[in-house]
Amino acid sequence: MSDPAPTLAFGLDSVRQLLDARESALSPLAAREATSRGRQRPEAPQPLRLAFQIDRDRIIHTRAFRRLKHKTQVFVTPDSDHVVTRMTHTIEVQQVARTIARALNLNEDLTEAIALGHDLGHTPFGHAGEEELARLLPDGFRHNEQSLRIVDLLELDGAGLNLSFETRDGILRHSKGRASVTSDDGWGTPATLEGEIVKLSDSIAYLNHDIQDAIRAGLLDEAELPPLARRTLGEDHPARINHLVTDCVRSSLVTFEAGQPAIVLSASTLEATDELRDFMFERVYHHERTLEGAARGQRIVAALFGYYEAHPDAILGWSLAADPPSRRAADYVSGMTDHYALERARQLGLAD
């Protein structure tokens, strides 16, 4: 006679208890579901996922997230298949941020959710498209505000994702000022350390992958990077990433122990990183070839915005019918991929 089939050792209640136990083992400084400021619309807890994991999963399944794979980062309509897109940038930010969060015993789910959602609001043609919409829209346009607008209002046909406050805050406050990789851009410091991690990880990721893109494009050589950056951060891409992540963890732990927790870089690493950032603006972001592509992207964005503002009935979703035509046009155009924007401009006779 055969042995009876084994019974299931754990029920859903046990799964939830395990998740709660794992979260309770995080650093006292970590964000937790139990102390979250909640969602805009209350929801019952789920047995298999905690709040910030739900946020992360909802972001991954959005249309805006899928479109990131066809939005360029710096180089408009690049020739190489290896040039960074908003999608690959987002994944790199997620990887760097999760490594830091795990090392500091902070909430990885929240960190990932913020990282995956931080650039949902970016326009086609990189920052050039953002700058053009900022010029055209009466109230201005910022990609971080648009990212929040997407998760709050535009996804799910206007219902939004109903994300946790901490995820929404991190998405809004990830943007940085021009002065330094750690400066804010008018939105202040994120409410959580996890949000601070993503803000710094964004800089770590874009500076390093933009160097690789610029080298492939023939705009510079590794040996031309500032001596201080090469000496302090490392001679190549892996060394720089490793140094920046390790320095961040080490320096942040010092602030934890001092009772003034923050996500920071050491003074020497920050100086070298800011010098590298200034170098990239001078040699890459303001290079003639980069600016030529950006100008073309801006012309297309301006033409599409003008058309849809004048013809709001032609907007196929991705906007709120009650909004004024300018806002609807901005939502629609900013949601386009580079390819779709180019194709629509050609179809409408707007391409140059």
Each model region followed by its residue ranges:
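Short alpha-helical catalytic segment bearing the HExxH-like zincin motif
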Residues: T111-L116, K199
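Conserved short loop/turn motifs at secondary-structure junctions
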Residues: L116-G117, A134-R135, A321
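Histidine-centered, transition-metal-coordinating active-site segments
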Residues: M1-R86, T90, Q95-I100, N107-E108, ...
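Short, internal active-site loops enriched in acidic
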Residues: D119-L120, G177
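Short active-site segment of divalent metal-dependent hydrolases/proteases
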Residues: G121-F125, A205
